[in-house]
């Protein structure tokens, strides 16, 4: 291995840089969740329609992930990340200046293209630059960046949006992205494309039934999650009758719980690979089912958000780790598919949540999400029994 590109010892500094980038990308993907009401007020639109921002964004990511990964598969990875961030920053500036909802959506599509490339390559890069034997911890640190977006990024974005307007939130993300870009360019080593795969990898990957089952499970469970989570802000304000400050705290607790989820993953996922995933899905489904019954008691609803946040983080990490293991010979293609299908789930969930909100009322989003989670649990049980040998370990 060339010492100018990747050191044998690995670098925690490089992993931290990628975790910081993950914080930025996850903040901007979900920050509209906390700003739906304000954006809707600016453009005189109901939150159920504004929420379709999440669907369009997610589906652009899902459609673009694999093509963009293939188009960029031969580009040195540090250079590619710099280009991704330049597009990301320019699109956020346009978001802050958006004079119509259509322009805002156009800017979000630009961000979605950057997102598609970023998440297709980042997990495998974190594994590559990590010190030997520390790959699982590197993924955990990457997840911490994701979690901090929930803990600090989304609630902070909501606080800034309420105080200074939602446009300021997007401009602030652009500014933070510039600093992150400088940090990435300085800390990452040269990273030639490696095991990125090609179109020839697709038939090979789809001939692995355990991997295909993981992909289907991801779509089902993430759809369940985002049927409810996409509209948690209007749910908290309109159904649970919570104040703006309490709603921000609810989002903060949900995100903070993800930290504990990543700790649980690091400690127990390899020891109990099948049970860990099943427990995560069961906890997620239970959280969604209890959303409406506990909405009359804001304190209990906040406590529930802790279980909810831990469960979805555990699920996401377990799935990501298994995909990397089952497709170690084509990691970028496999992760592009995973990212794309994850976003299919986000978009489907946000769309379903919009339909449920308009047809059945906001109060029903948790129950519908719980029904999908139950379907996911049954699929996970089938996979655990049918593909026990392939899924017996999540080690990388």
Swiss-Prot record:
- One Gene Ontology cellular component annotation held by this UniProt entry: plasma membrane
Subcellular location(s) per record: Cell inner membrane
Membrane topology of the entry: Multi-pass membrane protein
Instruction: Say if the entry is tagged with keyword DNA damage.
Output: no
Query: Does this UniProt record's set of keywords contain Nucleus?
Result: no
**What are the transmembrane regions?**
15-35, 50-70, 81-101, 103-123, 136-156, 170-190, 209-229, 246-266, 276-296, 298-318, 333-353, 365-385
Q: Which domain of life is it from?
A: Bacteria
Gene Ontology MF annotations: carbohydrate transmembrane transporter activity; transmembrane transporter activity
- So what family is this one in? Belongs to the major facilitator superfamily. SotB (TC 2.A.1.2) family.
**Known function:** Involved in the efflux of sugars. The physiological role may be the reduction of the intracellular concentration of toxic sugars or sugar metabolites.
The protein's matches in HAMAP family, at most eight in alphabetical order, are given as: MFS_SotB (MF_00517)
Which PANTHER family does this one have?
PURINE EFFLUX PUMP PBUE, SUGAR EFFLUX TRANSPORTER
What is the name listed in the Swiss-Prot or TrEMBL entry for this protein? Probable sugar efflux transporter
């Amino acid at each position: 291995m060339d010492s100018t590109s990747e050191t044998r010892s690995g670098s925690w500094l490089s992993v931290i840089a990628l975790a910081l980038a993950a914080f930025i990308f996850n903040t901007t993907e979900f920050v509209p969740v906390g700003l739906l009401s304000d954006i809707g007020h600016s453009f005189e639109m109901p939150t159920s329609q504004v929420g379709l921002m999440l669907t369009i964004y997610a589906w652009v990511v899902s459609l673009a992930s694999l093509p963009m990964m293939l188009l960029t598969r031969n580009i040195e990875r540090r250079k590619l990340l710099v280009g991704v961030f330049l597009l990301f920053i320019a699109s956020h500036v346009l978001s802050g200046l958006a004079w119509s909802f259509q322009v805002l959506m156009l800017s979000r599509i630009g961000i979605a293209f950057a997102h598609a490339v970023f998440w297709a390559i980042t997990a495998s890069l974190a594994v590559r630059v990590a010190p030997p034997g520390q790959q699982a911890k590197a993924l955990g640190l990457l997840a911490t960046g994701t979690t901090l977006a929930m803990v600090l990024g989304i609630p902070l974005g909501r606080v800034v949006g309420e105080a200074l307007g939602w446009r300021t939130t997007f401009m602030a993300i652009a500014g933070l992205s510039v600093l992150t870009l400088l940090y990435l360019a300085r800390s990452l080593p040269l990273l030639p494309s490696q095991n990125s795969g090609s179109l020839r990898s697709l038939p090979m990957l789809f001939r692995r039934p355990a991997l295909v089952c993981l992909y289907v499970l991801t779509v089902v469970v993430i759809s369940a999650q985002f049927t409810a989570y996409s509209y948690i802000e209007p749910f908290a304000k309109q159904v649970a009758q919570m104040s703006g400050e309490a709603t921000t705290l609810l989002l903060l607790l949900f995100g903070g719980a993800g930290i504990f989820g990543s700790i649980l993953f690091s400690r127990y996922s390899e020891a109990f690979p099948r049970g860990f995933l099943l427990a995560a899905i069961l906890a997620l489904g239970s959280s969604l089912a209890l959303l409406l019954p506990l909405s009359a008691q804001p304190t209990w609803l906040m406590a529930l958000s802790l279980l909810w946040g831990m469960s979805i983080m555990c699920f996401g990490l377990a799935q990501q780790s298994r995909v990397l293991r089952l497709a170690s010979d084509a990691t970028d293609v496999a992760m592009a598919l995973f990212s794309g299908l994850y976003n299919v789930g986000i978009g489907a969930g946000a769309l379903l949540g919009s339909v449920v909100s308009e047809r059945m009322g906001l109060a029903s989003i948790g129950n519908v999400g719980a029904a999908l989670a139950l379907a996911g649990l049954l699929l996970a049980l089938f996979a655990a029994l049918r593909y026990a040998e392939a899924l017996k370990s999540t080690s990388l």
